[in-house]
């Protein structure tokens, strides 16, 4: 059955209008943002009875996890978002939105001559902008005049990031908090604002319950989904060799590293001869000494490429090697039709899916670096256990209450964090000291940041599952669950040589003398590149195991061994 785009599968009058909360699951590249942009512009919709209903433009607050997506929306001429994140953050008061909504801009659209004037009704911003906006503007006495009554719909794009990014950011907490507060205001009849959460990677949200009167729309199997044709598993050495060969042949490639240091090492050393045709992109630059001319040039070139991608939704034609980090795993479109190969170091499902989906034309090959070191949690596992103690939370909030009293803020009186620098500094200190607590502006208290724990647990479990599958020879099965439409295989030459050897020697599933096993082992050591004692430990990642041929001392096969292919049912 032919896959459809999201707009072809959703009817606003039946799927959106009746509900305060709508959860949309559809694959990467299915047109989620196109659908939301249509809500902001207004459009005509066919009804089941044949009528065509005109849907008026909605005021949309689109919250996304990546600045690149905001820049993309800002720079696109035919979208209905009239501002950018920095303008939104610099609003002095909530009331400034009134004059913003009353202003107009020129909009060019497909299907019209020239341009049309539209009211600047909708805003796109990052998760971080929501955190800063709450700090600057939220007051309990103005709750009924806050964002939920300034917009018709709050859309959370890349909703999985509310959990996924929680491991290293506080901003996702405030997006989650805004969603919950908006739903409470809606249930209390104080707003008609709807919340739409969208993602193409719902796995990390599996434990989330649908709120009362919520509507779940799962179109993962019905809608278009950008997936690579082939997913290949290889170690770092083999990946670098493959990259060299492809670059030498004139191809363009993308490499997603887990660390900035890896990006810089590849740029400076491994692919130095291609520096004039290479580009880098990453967030953190504290590893670079800005006093050095080379580092300043790297940062300038990085900023240029990031701005180019945001404006053009593609890499420059003269760039053949793009080295980046998870900064660009979501929120951007790379529409180059001549990029067919990508390499990724991540071992988590949601990150792999998001990274592969950046190239909208689709990849021919996605390489997963099987021996790449994964990022790990910096704090002790006891941190969350300690943070879960109610007496600690009560103590932090009692101290906060004392700080407010010292500042002359009466109990339960409305106040603004922005107006009290001392309290603002105390909140920042507590959140740094206790990373599993966040100050909640709506609750006016420190609350447990459980999404952070969920995020760290998810990535730890993903890494453990990858390691276990690798040791047990089940990597192909694991990755096949990530990309069900793709062909999954080992790319490495070691695997090919080992498979070819066993096929040619015809030594599988037959009793072997110890001398024959030693001869096989000696050959395998030359392929792997190092000696080994435990056959199963070293050969399971390649899909082979060894066992005794017989435990019966009277059997002619006693003392012999049998080598089998894992998964054949004969182990």
Label the model's feature ranges.
Residues 144-180:
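SF2 helicase catalytic motif II
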Residues 78-135, 305-309:
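Inter-Walker segment of RecA-like/P-loop motor cores
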Residues 60-70, 246-270:
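Conserved strand-helix element at the start of the C-terminal RecA-like helicase core
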């Amino acid at each position: 059955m032919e896959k459809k785009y999201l707009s072809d599968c959703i009817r606003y009058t039946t799927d959106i209008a009746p509900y305060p909360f709508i959860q949309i699951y559809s694959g990467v590249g299915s047109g989620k943002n196109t659908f939301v942009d249509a809500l902001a512009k207004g459009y005509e919709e066919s009804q089941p009875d044949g009528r065509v209903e005109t849907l008026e433009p909605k005021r949309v607050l689109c919250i996304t996890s990546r600045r690149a997506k905001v820049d993309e929306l800002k720079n696109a001429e035919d979208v209905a978002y009239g501002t950018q994140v920095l303008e939104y953050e610099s609003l002095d008061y909530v009331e400034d939105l009134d004059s913003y909504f009353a202003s107009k801009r020129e909009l060019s659209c497909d299907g019209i001559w020239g341009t049309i004037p539209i009211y600047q009704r909708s805003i796109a911003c990052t998760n971080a902008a929501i955190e800063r906006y709450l700090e600057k503007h939220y007051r309990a006495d103005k709750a009924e005049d806050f964002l939920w009554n300034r917009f018709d719909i709050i859309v959370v794009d890349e909703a999985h990031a509310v959990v996924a990014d929680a491991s290293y950011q506080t901003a996702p907490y405030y997006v989650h908090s805004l969603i919950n507060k908006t739903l409470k205001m809606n249930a209390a009849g104080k707003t008609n604002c709807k919340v739409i959460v969208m993602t193409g990677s719902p796995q990390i949200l599996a434990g989330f319950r649908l709120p009362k009167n919520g509507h779940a729309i799962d179109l993962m199997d019905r809608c278009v989904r950008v997936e690579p044709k082939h997913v290949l598993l290889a170690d770092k050495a083999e990946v670098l060799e493959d990259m060299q060969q492809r670059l030498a042949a004139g191809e363009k490639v993308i490499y997603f590293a887990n660390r900035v240091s890896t990006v810089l090492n590849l740029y400076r050393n491994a692919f130095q001869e291609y520096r004039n045709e290479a580009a880098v992109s990453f967030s953190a630059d504290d590893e670079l000494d800005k006093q050095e001319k080379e580092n300043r040039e790297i940062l300038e070139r990085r900023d240029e490429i990031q701005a180019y991608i945001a404006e053009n939704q593609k890499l420059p034609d003269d760039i053949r090697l793009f080295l980046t980090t998870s900064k660009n795993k979501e929120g951007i479109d790379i529409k180059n039709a001549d990029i067919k190969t990508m390499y990724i170091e991540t071992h988590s499902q949601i990150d792999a899916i998001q990274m592969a989906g950046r190239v909208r034309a689709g990849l021919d090959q996605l390489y997963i670096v099987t021996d790449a070191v994964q990022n790990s949690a910096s704090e002790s596992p006891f941190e969350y256990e300690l943070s879960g103690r109610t007496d600690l939370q009560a103590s932090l909030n009692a101290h906060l209450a004392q700080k407010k009293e010292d500042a002359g803020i009466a109990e339960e009186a409305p106040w603004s964090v922005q107006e009290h620098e001392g309290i603002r500094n105390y909140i920042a200190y507590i959140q740094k000291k206790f990373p599993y607590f966040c100050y909640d502006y709506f609750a006016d208290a420190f609350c447990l940041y459980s999404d952070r724990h969920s995020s760290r647990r998810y990535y730890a479990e993903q890494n453990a599952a990858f390691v276990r599958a690798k040791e047990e020879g089940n990597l192909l099965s694991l990755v096949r669950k990530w990309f069900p439409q793709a062909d999954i295989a080992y790319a490495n030459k070691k695997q090919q040589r080992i498979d070819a050897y066993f096929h040619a020697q015809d030594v599988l599933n037959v009793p072997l003398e110890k001398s024959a096993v030693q001869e096989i082992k000696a050959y395998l050591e030359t392929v792997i590149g190092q000696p080994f004692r435990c056959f199963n430990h070293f050969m399971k990642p390649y899909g082979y195991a060894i066992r005794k041929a017989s435990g019966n001392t009277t059997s002619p096969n006693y003392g012999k061994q049998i080598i089998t292919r894992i998964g054949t049912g004969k182990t």
